[in-house]
A protein has these predicted regions:
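P-loop NTP-binding module
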Residues: 4-168
């Protein structure tokens, strides 16, 4: 699977490029206990999910407890990349249908990497993301993980990515 490139080819030049990005981020956030960041682009198909997956993998390989969150509630894809279930995810938690522990799944590829998929497509993604429950979601994750990486929807297509900015 090319989306999990750094897992499949950890010694490649591409993997080294992701390590370089990690090192630069470490320099910028030095001294911070927890780090939440998102990968954003203006339109679909640019590589947000690819970069999110590989950055999360690099942090997990570095020994950091990492969670990768699929926050594109309108067009979920992260679950396909890892071959895991999307029956419950962020939308389930935000709608009050699942607890945080119920939606966290091990990646099955790296011991320090967990995945939270988007879950079933809700009728009201923007409202769920704007809710107080979403703030609680991120606060709870900060108590469990060193790095929280958010795979977002395209910035110019829906308001969801803008709503997420207050959490990263």
């Amino acid at each position: 699977n090319s989306s999990t490139f750094v897992i499949e080819s950890p010694k490649s030049p591409v993997s080294e490029s992701f390590r370089s990005i990690r090192t630069n981020i470490e320099y910028i956030v030095q001294g911070k206990d927890k780090c939440v960041f998102s990968v954003i682009s203006d339109s679909p198909g640019i590589g947000k999910t690819y970069i999110s997956i590989n950055m999360a993998s690099i942090y997990a390989m570095y020994g950091k407890k990492t969670v990768l969150i699929g926050m594109d509630l309108r067009k979920p894809r992260l679950y396909q990349e890892f071959g895991i279930s999307n029956k419950m995810g962020v939308s389930s938690y935000l709608a009050g249908k699942a607890s945080l522990n119920e939606i966290i799944q091990p990646s099955g590829k790296l011991p320090n990497l967990d995945i939270i998929t988007a879950g079933p497509i809700p009728p009201n993604p923007a409202e769920l993301i704007a809710s107080d429950k979403c703030s609680k979601f991120f606060e709870e994750l900060k108590t469990q993980y060193d790095y929280i990486i958010v795979d977002t929807p395209p910035l110019l297509w829906v308001t969801d990515a803008l709503l997420l900015m207050k959490h990263v």
